[in-house]
Curated annotation (Swiss-Prot):
Name recorded for this polypeptide: UPF0210 protein Mbur_0828
NCBIfam families, sorted: PRK05313.1 (NF003700)
Top-level taxon of the source organism: Archaea
Species: Methanococcoides burtonii (strain DSM 6242 / NBRC 107633 / OCM 468 / ACE-M)
CDD domains reported in the protein's UniProt record: RNR_PFL_like_DUF711
Record-stated family: Belongs to the UPF0210 family.
Annotated signal peptide: none
């Protein structure tokens, strides 16, 4: 393939000036063969399986990073949902399992490990219940473990008993990590239609239909897309879409190249490339900045949802041409604390929780990294989750909620997490009650569009 000098310079510019990086190389590992009734034996089995497969992951990704000169920000692991593989264990809680995952992650040198997870969209098994009840202590006593719970699908509807439970779990997790502004909640996500091959945290787990070991890659390039849009001379929206498509193709192609080389060197399957635009707290490396480059005064004003729909669609169209295997979440992320433009919009009063909810109907993945007052009730948190699950269920898409009820904080305050997690201004929630609705429980039935056979 002929590569022109200007293409090489363009790639260098993306990395040096526009914050382009491979956000994550995530290794998925199957733990189903590790099951045992003795919790100590089970913990030993999963530790050996994870460290056996992942011992060369960090070294290999760093070699590939040096080979191509493309930064790889995070190395991560996703495992089979622990609620499934630990159900046979004779134990009352799974905190020791979370600590084993954390130790394995530490020993192989990765950034995060996902899969402290349960799939409860149609009902809750004893193993699911043990895992859910273990989440607050598990996340408080570990550094790298991430938890996720799938409570809804388009085919099954919404398990409102699980939704009600998760409101309390989010509150307890915030309280258990109150010394760090409730950071445990940044490692807990509640899903509708959770994908089995998502490389991004906190929602990554290794699905039941996956191979024994696989490499999935997530890219990041809002700064590159932002620059591409701003360089256009008085474009119409069709021309903006075309520019985003071309840029997404280039970004995705680099991710594909890196992912395949890592998987080749590790001798494991290449799974998927996740096309998602993942922002960082860096100025300009922002999804909100792209929307403002299209002509909005600030993210959150009228027209924001339409601009985001254009962006999300163009990213998918361009990215899908660059990879044979696209998967995961694949869209544009709107995590408030991780996006400098979103933070600014909230502080200006332009971006509300209700507007963010509308935006989630046209992008991936949901209400993400949003700080709310610490005294918000569990029922209100559950109701916010239920609203977001309904959007996912009806629209046949992945949606999620990652809320931080910041202990001791009120509207106007902010919480500082640092690093990629950034800073979150505390946002207003409705002062009116949803408690009676949430207390009814049961299941919201699957919609008519679930009947596809």
């Amino acid at each position: 393939m002929l590569i022109h000098p200007e293409e090489i310079l363009e790639t260098i510019h993306m990395i040096k000036a526009e914050n382009f990086d491979i956000r994550t190389v995530t290794m998925g590992i199957n733990l189903r063969g590790c099951c045992h009734s003795d919790i100590d034996v089970f913990n030993k089995n999963i530790y050996n399986k994870i460290t056996g497969y992942a011992k060369e992951l960090v070294r290999t990704t760093e070699e590939v990073q040096n080979l191509y000169g493309i930064p790889i920000t995070n190395k991560r692991i996703a495992v089979t949902p622990i609620a499934i593989v630990a159900e046979s264990c004779n134990t009352e809680d799974y905190v020791s399992i979370a600590k084993t995952l954390d130790r394995a992650a530490e020993d192989v040198g990765i950034d995060f490990i996902g899969g402290f997870s349960a799939l409860v969209h149609k009902g809750i098994t004893p193993g699911d219940m043990k895992l859910i009840n273990s989440i607050p202590q598990a996340l408080a006593s570990t550094k790298k473990v991430c938890a996720s719970i799938n409570v809804a699908t388009t085919k099954a509807g919404i398990n409102m008993d699980a939704v009600a439970m998760m409101g309390h779990i989010v509150k307890k997790t915030a309280e258990a990590t109150k010394d760090a502004d409730g950071i445990g909640c940044a490692k807990l996500v509640i899903f509708a239609n959770a994908p089995e091959d998502n490389p991004f945290m906190a929602g990554a787990f290794h699905g039941i239909g996956e191979p024994d070991c696989v490499i999935n890659v997530g890219v990041s390039g809002p700064g590159v897309v932002n620059s591409a849009v701003r360089e256009l001379k008085d474009p119409d929206l069709g021309e903006i879409s075309e520019a985003i498509k071309k840029t997404a193709f280039k970004i995705t192609r680099m991710g594909e190249m890196v992912g395949r080389e890592v998987s080749r060197r590790l001798n494991v399957d290449f799974g998927v490339l996740d096309l998602s635009l993942a922002p960082t707290p860096e100025i300009g490396d922002s999804v909100a900045a792209i929307l403002e480059a299209m002509g909005l005064e600030t993210c959150g004003t009228h027209g924001t949802t339409a601009a985001l729909a254009l962006l999300n669609d163009a990213v998918k169209k361009g990215g899908s041409m660059a990879s044979s295997y696209v998967g995961g979440l694949s869209g544009a992320f709107i995590p408030v604390s991780e996006d400098a433009g979103m933070i600014r919009a909230v502080e200006l009063g332009a971006l509300s929780l209700e507007k963010l909810e509308a935006m989630t109907s046209v992008c991936s993945v949901g209400l993400d990294m949003i700080a709310i007052p610490g005294d918000t009730s569990a029922a209100t948190i559950s109701a916010i989750i239920a609203d977001e699950m309904a959007i996912g269920m009806i629209n046949k898409k992945t949606t999620a909620v990652r809320l931080i009820p910041a202990p001791g904080k009120k509207v106007g305050d902010s919480v500082e997490f640092g690093g990629l997690l950034g800073r979150a201004p505390v946002m207003k929630v409705s002062e009116f009650s949803s408690e009676k609705f949430i207390a009814r429980g049961g299941r919201i039935p699957a919609p008519i569009q679930a009947l596809t056979n």
